[in-house]
Design a protein with these regions (language model features):
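Short, conserved "switch-loop" micro-motifs in signal-transduction and mechanochemical regulators
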Residues: 103-104
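The short loop immediately C-terminal to the conserved phospho-acceptor aspartate in CheY-like receiver
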Residues: 68-70, 74-75
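Short hydrophobic/Thr-rich beta-strand motif most characteristic of the beta2 strand and flanking loop
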Residues: 45-53, 61
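Short, flexible helix-to-coil linker/hinge segments that flank and couple to helix-turn-helix
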Residues: 107-114, 118-165
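Acidic catalytic/metal-coordinating carboxylates
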Residues: 53-57, 77-83
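Conserved sequence signature across two-component system core domains
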Residues: 26-27, 52, 70
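Short amphipathic alpha-helix used as the core "switch/output" element in two-component signaling
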Residues: 60, 82-94
């Protein structure tokens, strides 16, 4: 007797398998890009289809690779992640944005959400939480780093300094 096939986390028993969530990673640091891609490709339901090193490349790559969720750093050469998020939102490409950054500041969170991001996490987020955040965003939800969300409530909508703006 042959054992049943292993369960796929993206399919319910007896249903048709779903296509993996197609991801783009935009970060100017090649090591970070590569590490994130390797990590996320370990997930059965996630597939990194594009990697870019600047905000200038994001919209074209999303169009070319039919991306479901774009992971964007804030500080990149050319267009930053916040400007790029607004451009993706305006282009109506059906791509959701998750900001993944070292800039864990409430003002950046506020600006990212205003630009149309569906999520905002800092780069020290545990890997399993990053993968789950991508799934939630793809399903139409929002994900915000809980510490930043709390700070935003306490400090108000725009605690960025003049230099950060």
């Amino acid at each position: 007797m042959t054992p049943p096939p292993a369960a796929n986390p993206t399919t319910a028993p007896g249903s048709v398998p779903q296509a993996p969530i197609r991801l783009l990673i935009a970060d100017d640091q090649a090591l970070v890009r590569g590490a994130l891609a390797t990590l996320l490709d370990l997930e059965d339901d996630l597939e990194v289809v594009a990697q870019v090193g600047s905000g200038n490349e994001v919209v074209a790559a999303v169009r070319a690779h039919d991306v479901d969720v774009a992971l964007l750093d804030i500080d990149m050469p050319g267009k930053d992640g916040l400007t790029t998020t607004a451009e993706l939102s305006a282009a109506n490409l059906g791509c959701r944005v998750l900001i993944v950054t070292t800039f864990g500041r409430p003002g950046y969170l506020s600006r990212a959400m205003e630009a149309g991001a569906s999520g905002f996490l800092v780069k020290d987020t545990p890997p399993e939480e990053l993968a789950e955040a991508i799934r939630r965003i793809h399903a139409g939800g929002r994900v915000i780093d809980p510490t930043l969300a709390q700070e935003l409530v306490i400090l108000g909508p725009d605690p960025l300094s003049a230099r950060e703006k």
